[in-house]
C-alpha cells in the first residue's frame, strides 16, 4: 500500500505571526425564543516586519471568535514600507467611519507614541518610531481600520521617483 504524503498546501507557513486582541464584546441577537448571545473579537495580526491586518470574528464562545478574527486578519494583510529607522517614509492620514488617524515619522529613539488600537496596529506592523494621533471616534474597530487605511497609503521614495519619472537622487535633494 502506497504511503500518501501530506499536501504542502494544507500546512500553513509559520512565519512568527503575532496576534493581539483589541476588544472582546458580548453581542446579542433577538430571536423568536429570546436573545441569542455570541461574542465578537477584534484581533490584529502582524509579523513585526511590515505586514499587518485587522480581523473581526464572531462565535458562540470567546476562543472561537478569536480564532475567526485571526483568520480574517490574515486575509486582510497589507504591506507597510518601513525606513531604516523603523519609521514610516512620510506623514499620512487615514479614516474609517467617524475615526481618523494622523501619523508622522519620528527620529530613532522616539518610540511608538500612539494610543489604543492604533498603537497595537503599529507595533505589530514593526514600526518602532512614530507619532500618531486619533481624532473623532474612540471606537477601537474604526480606529484600527483607520490606522490600516493610513498605512496603505504609504509610498516609498523609489515608488514616488518612478511615478514622477525622475531619478531617486532628485527626490532626496
Curated annotation (Swiss-Prot):
**Which Pfam families does the entry link to?**
Ribosomal_S5, Ribosomal_S5_C
> According to the UniProt record, which cysteines are disulfide-bonded?
none
Q: What InterPro entries does this protein's entry cite?
A: Ribosomal_Su5_D2-typ_SF, Ribosomal_uS5, Ribosomal_uS5_bac-type, Ribosomal_uS5_C, Ribosomal_uS5_N, Ribosomal_uS5_N_CS, Ribsml_uS5_D2-typ_fold_subgr
Which ranges form a coiled coil?
Answer: none
Q: Which Gene3D superfamilies match?
A: 3.30.160.20, 3.30.230.10
Entry's Gene Ontology molecular function annotations: rRNA binding; structural constituent of ribosome
Q: Which GO terms describe its cellular component?
A: small ribosomal subunit
Question: Boundaries of each S5 DRBM domain copy?
Answer: 17-80
Q: What biological process terms from GO does the record include?
A: translation
**NCBIfam families (alphabetical):** rpsE_bact
Annotated function:
With S4 and S12 plays an important role in translational accuracy. Located at the back of the 30S subunit body where it stabilizes the conformation of the head with respect to the body.
Q: How does it assemble?
A: Part of the 30S ribosomal subunit. Contacts proteins S4 and S8.
Family, according to the entry, reads as follows:
Belongs to the universal ribosomal protein uS5 family.
What protein name is recorded for this chain?
Answer: Small ribosomal subunit protein uS5
In the UniProt record, the gene name given for this protein reads rpsE
